[in-house]
Amino acid sequence: MKIEYKRLTEKELDNFIDKRIHQLREEGAKEEIDLVPALKDYYQRHMAEGTFVSWIALDGNTMIGTSGMSFVEKPPYFGCPSGKMGLLSSMYTDPDYRRKGIAKELLSRVIEDAKEYGCGTIQITASEMGVKLYADFGFVHNENFMQYKL
């Protein structure tokens, strides 16, 4: 098994979106709408603007792992003087390839991208399965996070 890691390009976008939908289903999300058009629009726009980056893992021509980092900016604060934040998403590894270090490698690559972008912090809403990976990397729970659904 020779795994290749590369940046996501528009050529792989449809396959990447399929993996994202599979990830959401696996995490128990309810499918109430067709997300494909919205995801495609989001990724195309933000990849073009440089505010979304992704590394993918391939076994031959088969995409077996994904990662994603969206970059956002908010007013600077003491904990993040740049105001730049990374929002980690789309971390997915095909079940047959789990526990082989693939997610760890993908995560390290998007974290490097966040550093290069100037992010002072990275946030993620972690699945149960991913908590150990993120904790091992140094992510900590933030008790202050709240959300208001519109």
Question: Where does each model-flagged region fall?
Answer:
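A short helix-loop-beta-strand connector motif used in the catalytic cores of GNAT acetyltransferases and
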Residues: 44-56, 87
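Conserved acetyl-CoA pyrophosphate-binding loop and the N-cap/start of the following alpha-helix
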Residues: 97, 101-109
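Conserved GNAT-fold acetyl-CoA-binding loop/helix
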Residues: 21-43, 83
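Conserved acetyl-CoA binding element of GNAT-fold acetyltransferases
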Residues: 79-95, 144-147
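Conserved GNAT acetyl-CoA-binding A-motif
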Residues: 107, 114-126
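Conserved beta-strand-loop-alpha-helix junction that forms the acyl-donor binding cleft
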Residues: 122-132, 147-150
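Conserved beta-strand in the GNAT
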Residues: 56, 62-71, 87, 92
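A short beta-loop-alpha structural element at the N-terminal edge
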Residues: 4-18
